[in-house]
Amino acid sequence: MSVKKRGISVIVTLMLFLSLSVVTATDTKAAEETKARSVEELAMIDGSYLIKDEESIGATTPMTRGEDLMTGYSKVRRLGAGEIYAGGTTIAAHTVERIGIGVIIERAKEEDTSWEFYDSWQKFNENTDRAATSKRLKVEGGYYYRVRCTHSANNDVSSSFTDGIFVQP
């Protein structure tokens, strides 16, 4: 291949790369602006958005963990009219004497200003690095449901919560 053809090939490749970079950056910025706009329009109760999505997952914040607790998750999923899946997981940084999770189900209507208690349960394990629990629940439609979890590993404690998902009547 001649030097001239190689130079043209490099220039064309560079132009193609730059044009793809500009298109990708523009698409990403547009998607972020759309998401920010749509989040601003959603109602919120006590830190949880009221959403129409099929599921929501929450996680512990890094600042609230200690030396034993690594992370924790909470999850709620709409299974159909009048039924949800709810639960959570606690993960320790290593094997601990006692690890646990407490799960609280709360519900609210769109016009409410606070969540009301619906159901709860807990699970503890010993000499392991994780605890998980979940349930399928029959629920009343016309409400948003969220899951709040308390995560513990030995003396470290943290919490997580989901957004509220709408369940059809």
Feature annotation, model-predicted:
Residues 1-77:
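N-terminal prepro-regions of secreted/extracellular proteins
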Residues 66-103:
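Short, surface-exposed binding/anchoring microloops in extracellular/periplasmic proteins
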Residues 88, 129-139, 163:
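Exposed aromatic-hydrophobic patches
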Residues 103, 114-128:
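Solvent-exposed serine/threonine-rich low-complexity stretches and specific carbohydrate-binding patches
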Residues 103-109:
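Conserved aromatic beta-strand anchor motif in extracellular beta-sandwich/beta-rich domains
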Residues 143-154:
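Short, aromatic- and glycine-rich surface loops/edge beta-strands on solvent-exposed regions
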Residues 156-169:
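Short beta-strand elements
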